[in-house]
Structure formats: C-alpha cells, structure tokens
Amino acid sequence: VAERIGGNGLTAWVALTKIARLQPGESVYISSAAGGVGSAAAQFAALLGAKRIVGSTRNAEKSRTLTDRLGYTDAFVYQSGKVSAQLRDIIPEGIDVYLDNVGGEQLEAAIAAFKDYGRAALIGAVAQYSALTPPSAPYNLFDVVGKSLTLQGFLVRDYKHLQEELEEFIIPHIQSGRVVPQDTVTYGFDHIVEAFLSMLKGGNIGKAIVSIE
C-alpha cells in the first residue's frame, strides 16, 4: 500500500499540512487538479476537514472526474484569460489555501481570490515548462502585501522524514477505500517520451507511470 502513495502523495501532504497549514472548515483551490499531486491533495484535504475543494483542469471529462472520483466539491475547465473570473464565480467568498502546480495565470487568479491571511504552497510551474517564453508575473503581486498573504515554495526532498507520518495517517483510509491512489500507466520504455509529453499536456489522471514490463 505504501508504495502507491509515492512522492506525489508526500508532496500533497507537505503542501497541505506544513506549508499551507490547511485548517478544518477552510476552502482550498488546486491547479492541475487531476495530476499526481492534485488527485492526492483533494482526497487528503477532504479527510483534513476542508469545506470547499475547488480544482481546475483542461477539459470537461476531467472536470467530471474531479468531482465524481477525486473528492473535489467544485471543478471548472479553465479558459486562458478568464481564470480569475471563473474562480470568482465558483467561490465568490474566496479561498484560504492554494496549491500551485502551474504558476502564471492560475497563481494570479488565486491571489485575487484569496481571503486575508491566505496561504499558497508553490509546488510546480507547468505553465512555463514547455512555454517558448516564460509567462508574465502576476499583475496583482501587491495583493500579497495588502492581504497579508503567504506564498512559500518547497522541495519534497527536504521533507522525506515525514513519510512515516503520512503513511500512519493515510494507509487506513486507503485500506478502507476512502482514498484511492490514481495512476495513468503507459506500457513500454520506448513510449517514455510520449508519456512525458502527455503529462505536460495534462493527459494523465493521477501519477504518470511508464511500465517496462
């Protein structure tokens, strides 16, 4: 069971409990919501008592998966240039916590949606991994000051000592079926590049795995 949690699960755990310090009754927004970290984080957040768990993704099929299988209370298909408005429409009261797997416009939207004293865990920057030019910085960075926000990046390798803590918390929930690890498996080592590019384009649900068997 433990091996199915993996680095994505530990990343989600650290982001929620140590960096963003999610509290029961709070609302959380997760970008790249169907990916390895996002799919774990939503299920963890529900167990930790989050009131609203909002996720953004690339298409309607994935959006349905977020609410049907992964524990999200709300989901939307993001549209370039409209993410802030979309997020505001879904959760007009604002968010307390943001798990940022994307950067760029998604981070900008989260800053706009934050309540005072909101906390963001900066995990990745998918928006710039394959971009020809880096995305512009969020226009509203001064809101970090005005709302007393906390934005903190981290590397999961610095938190490996928390693996046992995570396993003690999550394994009973996996065994009971309340948490279901998500994988997208590509078979054949010769398809590794294809699998990687698919992951960058959001083609996976949960952890992207290449099996050489």
Where are these regions (language model features)?
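C-terminal capping/lid region of NAD(P)-dependent oxidoreductase domains
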Residues: 176-185, 193-213
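Glycine-rich phosphate-binding loop and adjacent beta-alpha segment
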Residues: 50, 66-67, 105-179, 212-213
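Short SAM/SAH-binding signature in class I
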Residues: 93-100, 118-119
